[in-house]
From Swiss-Prot:
Its cofactor is heme b. It comes from Streptomyces avermitilis (strain ATCC 31267 / DSM 46492 / JCM 5070 / NBRC 14893 / NCIMB 12804 / NRRL 8165 / MA-4680). It is an enzyme of class 5 (isomerase). This is Peroxynitrite isomerase. Pfam families: THAP4_heme-bd. A motif (GXWXGXG) lies at residues 34-40. Coiled coil: none annotated. It comes from the Bacteria. Binds 1 heme b group per subunit, that coordinates a highly solvent-exposed Fe(III) atom. Homodimer. Its EC number is 5.99.-.-. The lineage of its organism: Bacteria, Bacillati, Actinomycetota, Actinomycetes, Kitasatosporales. It catalyses: peroxynitrite = nitrate. GO terms for molecular function: heme binding; metal ion binding; peroxynitrite isomerase activity.
Amino acid sequence: MVDPAPEHPYPDGHRPDEAPAPHALLEPVLGLLGSWYGRGEGGYPTLTGDFGYAQELTFSHDGRPFLRYEARAWLLDADDAPLRPSARECGWWRLQPDGRVEALITQPTGIAEIMVGRATGNTIDLSTHEVALAPTAKKVNATRRRYTLTDDDTLTFHHDLEAVGQPMQHHLSARLRRRG
């Protein structure tokens, strides 16, 4: 018989005031820790029209100088009822001593991005440094993302996209509220 797995000895922290203590380099992004949920709107010239979606973001840490990041989204119908999953991604945000943020983000659709940017005040701006594509992934050239804490419990998200022959332009935006 297999013994049950022991409790993980190094749980992630989801709030600045819970163990493990956040690494000092995380100071500029501590406000992101936790889970966020909200709704947004999106569109792109290669899609059949604009759409509404719901989104959940989670940021946590294990005491080292990076954040674990996960995002899930699903499309909503005209009555705000869930239609189907639409996007999912996960990765790591690495904070540097000079204030830079390096984000490694992967999607199950075969897209992996390395993004670089800065955390300035309540805003984190990230832009593509490199994109790696699986052989069957859609062509993505670059993205830009902005995360802004408008208050302790509200996070806005904006995402621009250059893909499938289209120039860089608005793709997604959402307003999220802190959960719990």
